[in-house]
């Protein structure tokens, strides 16, 4: 579990370290607010992703299933600044085993709510779906803006990082890969 008291103490010390007065009017409740925020945005650390997965048997469906533009936010583990974007998650069912559509979004949500790297998050989503339903293939593409590149360092607001993870047939078969990427990149 998250130790909110430790977080409050640490935030107070950070405020002091940057030359602020943690006892001034506008900052009095900041340590508590940050502790509650961290409990929420890092809730994926204490959630087993398997608990959000529900599998259905749908023998008739044997084509690509794609959930596009799933909003996501996570905290870059290098600077503890957010990265915000969307995930596109596609898979090709095997023997009719499918995930509920909302479960795809929940997988993204749980795995995002941890200190993360976008590259690892992309792979974790793909691997979770591979393990859960053993599809013929999985493709995950994440597009995100990293505030560590927007607010500091290179200071390039609006730049996006795109990562992909391909598993199964989407990695080994060029035609299948082209089809799934065309679906992901379509504007409709």
From Swiss-Prot:
<keyword id="KW-0547">Nucleotide-binding</keyword>
<dbReference type="Pfam" id="PF01227">
    <property type="entry name" value="GTP_cyclohydroI"/>
</dbReference>
<dbReference type="InterPro" id="IPR020602">
    <property type="entry name" value="GTP_CycHdrlase_I_dom"/>
</dbReference>
<dbReference type="InterPro" id="IPR043134">
    <property type="entry name" value="GTP-CH-I_N"/>
</dbReference>
<dbReference type="GO" id="GO:0046654">
    <property type="term" value="P:tetrahydrofolate biosynthetic process"/>
</dbReference>
<keyword id="KW-0862">Zinc</keyword>
<keyword id="KW-0554">One-carbon metabolism</keyword>
<protein>
    <recommendedName>
        <fullName>GTP cyclohydrolase 1</fullName>
        <ecNumber>3.5.4.16</ecNumber>
    </recommendedName>
</protein>
<dbReference type="GO" id="GO:0006729">
    <property type="term" value="P:tetrahydrobiopterin biosynthetic process"/>
</dbReference>
<dbReference type="GO" id="GO:0008270">
    <property type="term" value="F:zinc ion binding"/>
</dbReference>
<keyword id="KW-0342">GTP-binding</keyword>
<comment type="pathway">
    <text>Cofactor biosynthesis; 7,8-dihydroneopterin triphosphate biosynthesis; 7,8-dihydroneopterin triphosphate from GTP: step 1/1.</text>
</comment>
<dbReference type="InterPro" id="IPR001474">
    <property type="entry name" value="GTP_CycHdrlase_I"/>
</dbReference>
<keyword id="KW-0378">Hydrolase</keyword>
<comment type="similarity">
    <text>Belongs to the GTP cyclohydrolase I family.</text>
</comment>
<feature type="binding site">
    <location>
        <position position="148"/>
    </location>
    <ligand>
        <name>Zn(2+)</name>
    </ligand>
</feature>
<dbReference type="InterPro" id="IPR018234">
    <property type="entry name" value="GTP_CycHdrlase_I_CS"/>
</dbReference>
<dbReference type="GO" id="GO:0006730">
    <property type="term" value="P:one-carbon metabolic process"/>
</dbReference>
<dbReference type="GO" id="GO:0003934">
    <property type="term" value="F:GTP cyclohydrolase I activity"/>
</dbReference>
<dbReference type="GO" id="GO:0005525">
    <property type="term" value="F:GTP binding"/>
</dbReference>
<feature type="binding site">
    <location>
        <position position="79"/>
    </location>
    <ligand>
        <name>Zn(2+)</name>
    </ligand>
</feature>
<dbReference type="InterPro" id="IPR043133">
    <property type="entry name" value="GTP-CH-I_C/QueF"/>
</dbReference>
<keyword id="KW-0479">Metal-binding</keyword>
<feature type="binding site">
    <location>
        <position position="76"/>
    </location>
    <ligand>
        <name>Zn(2+)</name>
    </ligand>
</feature>
<dbReference type="GO" id="GO:0005737">
    <property type="term" value="C:cytoplasm"/>
</dbReference>
<comment type="subunit">
    <text>Toroid-shaped homodecamer, composed of two pentamers of five dimers.</text>
</comment>
